[in-house]
Amino acid sequence: MNDQQQQQWAQAIENARQQAQPKPSCPQDWGATLKDAYIVQGLGLQQRPDDAVIGFKGALTNQRVQETFGTTEPALGLLFASSARPERVIQSADFTKGMIETELGFVLSRRITAPIESVSALQSCFDGICLMVELVDLNFSQFPPSLPDLIMHNAAAAQFLKGAVSPIMDPDSLTLTLESAGDTRHRGAALDVLGGQWKALHWMVNQALALGHTLLPGQVLMTGSVGSVQPLKAGDYVLTGGDLAPLIFRVV
């Protein structure tokens, strides 16, 4: 893709988002690469000047999800302030093909300006952990999308919920369980994300820095789907994980 195509496509994506249209696929003859995809994702920030980036999301960090999209690589997305749902009520009418992902979030305790060389150094950068739920919308005009298309559409990000923050504990020892109407919808081991939560965070931090993003205290990094992805259906839900505060939410 050339510069003009990148700008043009960033605008097309934003138009589709604002008009709640299916996420368009980039013309194949433009030959979009992963580098192009992240440039377009970054240009999307210019389309939303009043919508702060309050964190980052890992996508395709789970082998099962990677298989769905035919890739072996993770992807990075942005968490916008407008996507947060602190009231913990999700309107299903906001989605065309909504899905529920259960995840862990990690809260930064300091600014990071240089790549982190080791997991041990990384651990000192975070002081909080919480349960999170991400609501994605897989309303792509072509499914599954290519990896560049997924990245350009900010990894299908739509809305997210953040649980109460607890002091850092061993995240890889956690099992996340999603329940609704007395039934267990799924149960997943946090260790399944990129072979470990700290490994996932290590990749996310260094990838964000490589893309020119700023990592600031208070931002949350959501590491990717733990367990299977569930279709968005009306009901009351409870997400639990070890000693972390349960995350209770409703879909209407």
Named regions from a protein language model:
Residues N2-G196, A234, V238, D243-V252:
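Catalytic-core "active-site belt" of small-molecule-metabolizing enzymes
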Residues Q197-L232:
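A conserved acidic, glycine/proline-rich C-terminal tail/linker
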